Amino acid sequence: MTLLNVSDLSHHYAHGGFSGKHQHQAVLNNVSLTLKSGETVALLGRSGCGKSTLARLLIGLESPSQGNISWRGEPLAKLNRAQRKAFRRDIQMVFQDSISAVNPRKTVREILREPMRHLLSLKKSEQLARASEMLKAVDLDDSVLDKRPPQLSGGQLQRVCLARALAVEPKLLILDEAVSNLDLVLQAGVIRLLKKLQQQFGTACLFITHDLRLVERFCQRVMVMDNGQIVETQAVGDKLTFSSDAGRVLQNAVLPAFPVRRRTSEKV
């Protein structure tokens, strides 16, 4: 089942010039893509190529300058009030900057309950039980419930944001560099959790990342973005090889997992 369909999407930002006239800075250019239920797709690209802007458009935080975004066959621009509420529940995003994504005055308990209060019909006791369950799933315990964001480490706060997104059991989870910054042990645990959700609920995942190792471990498809365009789409197999210049640059930039000893025939 197709969850998200994007066709001929372009976007620009207007800013004033010295002459007083508005100038347009193109960020996305004729982007098209499809995401299906239960699949895991990576959007790979260097910083500043338009990945995060595309994500903001996909979840409805901004409207595109041109093109169409459809959710389950319905254009986002034409969703009625009830459909928009369901859309906000079904598609969740975890941002790279977790500090800006939460209210620093709220406790973790309040942060986790917020989407459940607005998007789900759960009693308070059920909300609290699910909050505790989601914390456990991201390797945190109830001791953080009464803490506020400034009292948490960056990794802890990132996991709180992930738990908040998972609490409403979304159909599509977009992670904007949200897993790449975790250590390898936590990253592996989060990936196991996401695989479980995919099996249980058919949750689709879109990883926005520059981490090629994450792509190879978890994703089924990868799209390479460069200068606001998707320049290549590849299935992820045993040996991932890119044909685009942008893809090859990213692949060549990956460091080996362990230091490689150079061979030499010279004797010291």
From Swiss-Prot:
- Give the GO cellular component terms, alphabetically: plasma membrane
Subcellular localization is given as:
Cell inner membrane
Q: What is this protein called?
A: Nickel import ATP-binding protein NikE
Similarity annotation: Belongs to the ABC transporter superfamily. Nickel importer (TC 3.A.1.5.3) family.
Coiled coil ranges (UniProt) are none
Job description of the protein: Part of the ABC transporter complex NikABCDE involved in nickel import. Responsible for energy coupling to the transport system.
- The primary site where this protein sits is membrane
Question: Mind telling me which InterPro entries this protein's record contains?
Answer: AAA+_ATPase, ABC_transp_ATP-bind, ABC_transporter-like_ATP-bd, ABC_transporter-like_CS, Nickel_NikE, P-loop_NTPase
Alphabetical UniProt keywords: ATP-binding, Cell inner membrane, Cell membrane, Ion transport, Membrane, Nickel, Nickel transport, Nucleotide-binding, Translocase, Transport
Q: What chemistry does it catalyse, as a reaction equation? A: Ni(2+)(out) + ATP + H2O = Ni(2+)(in) + ADP + phosphate + H(+)
Q: What is its EC number?
A: 7.2.2.11
Q: Which gene encodes it?
A: nikE
Q: Which residues form the ABC transporter domain?
A: 4-252
Q: How does it sit in the membrane?
A: Peripheral membrane protein
Give the GO molecular function terms. ABC-type nickel transporter activity; ATP binding; ATP hydrolysis activity; nickel cation binding
Residues at which ATP binds:
G45, R46, S47, G48, C49, G50, K51, S52
Subunit (UniProt): The complex is composed of two ATP-binding proteins (NikD and NikE), two transmembrane proteins (NikB and NikC) and a solute-binding protein (NikA).
Q: Which Pfam families match?
A: ABC_tran
